[in-house]
């Protein structure tokens, strides 16, 4: 674990409870869904309960501290809150049963509304070159519609609402039209011929593009199955296989830069949670691809990714707890001095 050089350094990377911490809600909520899907109900219940607590702390924390404000430059944080609410809502009927489909719809509605606002404001800032230095966090507002698309397809399956299927397809296209180009630009900025390399504090965000890869694979399988035609199903499978190919180099980059940064003592920040949700989306995509193709080893790969995600959740939780406790102790010492 990284050792902080001072309490002040931790204060700089530990914002108050609020949307900046919503990566934890995203990761824990999705983990609970995946554990239930793969037959670990007791552990799934534990993580779902934890996700509920995290959601309450994040929302309550924002109501108290109002940090961050709802401004364009901090839309990535609000995009995380959007995806966290959608992930929590999606997990509820999966983990606790069909009685909570209504709760899922409410979470999806709120999360999607916030996400579309974040998407609109941030894509405008990027196009106008007002989003600052390129970073993988640029992609957070752009991936939000894809997360909403997956849940919309599931809502369509349950409630049998044709309009929801077209909403799902539209949200899918919204991310596909923007995120790949933006991520390509960021990769070129960090790893191109004239690049300086990715800063230590930004290394956890290298997982974010994998979130689009995994989430779009899952969405493509659900949308293809919902349309029902052989062509739609085949297109979804082909899309998933192509995304699977992209997973190899992008995953290798994320593993290398993130683990190297941790071993070099990168200071903890909420960005470490970026190593959780994207891995979970890959697991979800592999699981649905297994269902679409009947290829069982896709499901085994999904299980491996759950193990990796669980490892990242544990590391992020322990490192975060240590960081918060050191900050509290530091403040107490300064007050007693």
Predicted regions and their residues:
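Structural signature of hydrophobic alpha-helical transmembrane segments
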Residues: 42-56, 102-116, 165-181, 237-247, ...
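Long amphipathic alpha-helical segments that form oligomerization/scaffold cores
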Residues: 104, 111-136, 155-164, 168
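Helix-coil boundary and interhelical linker segments in multi-pass alpha-helical membrane proteins
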Residues: 33-43, 92-103, 152-167, 221-235, ...
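C-terminal transmembrane-bundle signature of multipass membrane proteins
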Residues: 27-33, 55-63, 186, 212-228, ...
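Generic multipass alpha-helical transmembrane bundles of integral membrane proteins
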Residues: 110, 138, 144-254
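Membrane helical hairpin/interfacial module
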Residues: 36-111, 315
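Juxtamembrane helix-loop boundaries in multi-pass membrane proteins
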Residues: 4-34, 67-91, 108, 127-153, ...
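Hydrophobic, membrane-facing alpha-helical anchors
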Residues: 1-9, 52-68, 114-129, 162, ...
């Amino acid at each position: 674990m990284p050792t902080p050089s001072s309490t002040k350094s931790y204060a700089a990377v530990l914002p108050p409870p609020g949307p900046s911490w919503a990566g934890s809600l995203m990761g824990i909520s999705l983990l609970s869904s995946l554990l239930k899907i793969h037959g670990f109900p007791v552990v799934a219940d534990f993580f779902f309960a934890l996700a509920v607590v995290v959601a309450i702390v994040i929302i309550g924390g924002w109501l108290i501290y109002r940090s961050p404000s709802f401004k364009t430059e901090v839309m990535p944080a609000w995009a995380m809150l959007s995806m966290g609410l959608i992930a929590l809502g999606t997990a509820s009927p999966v983990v606790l049963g069909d009685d909570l489909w209504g709760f899922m719809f409410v979470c999806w509605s709120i999360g999607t509304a916030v996400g579309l606002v974040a998407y609109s404001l941030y894509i405008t800032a990027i196009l106008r070159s007002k989003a600052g230095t390129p970073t993988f966090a640029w992609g957070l507002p752009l991936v939000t519609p894809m997360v909403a698309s997956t849940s919309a397809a599931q809502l369509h399956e349950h409630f049998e609402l044709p309009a929801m299927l077209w909403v799902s397809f539209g949200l899918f296209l919204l991310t596909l039209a923007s995120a790949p180009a933006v991520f390509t630009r960021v990769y070129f900025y960090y790893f191109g011929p004239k690049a300086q390399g990715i800063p230590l504090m930004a290394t956890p965000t290298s997982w974010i593009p994998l979130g689009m890869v995994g989430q779009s694979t899952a969405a493509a399988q659900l949308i293809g199955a919902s349309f029902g035609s052989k062509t739609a199903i085949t297109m979804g499978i082909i899309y998933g296989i192509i995304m699977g190919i992209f997973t190899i180099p992008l995953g290798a980059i994320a593993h290398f830069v993130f683990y190297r940064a941790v071993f070099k003592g990168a200071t903890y920040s909420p960005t470490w949670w970026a190593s959780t949700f994207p891995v979970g989306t890959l697991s979800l995509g592999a699981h649905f691809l297994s269902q679409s193709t009947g290829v069982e080893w896709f499901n085994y790969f999904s299980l491996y990714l759950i193990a990796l995600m669980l490892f990242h959740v544990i590391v992020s939780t322990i490192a975060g707890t240590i960081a918060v406790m050191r900050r509290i102790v530091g403040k107490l010492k300064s007050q007693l001095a």
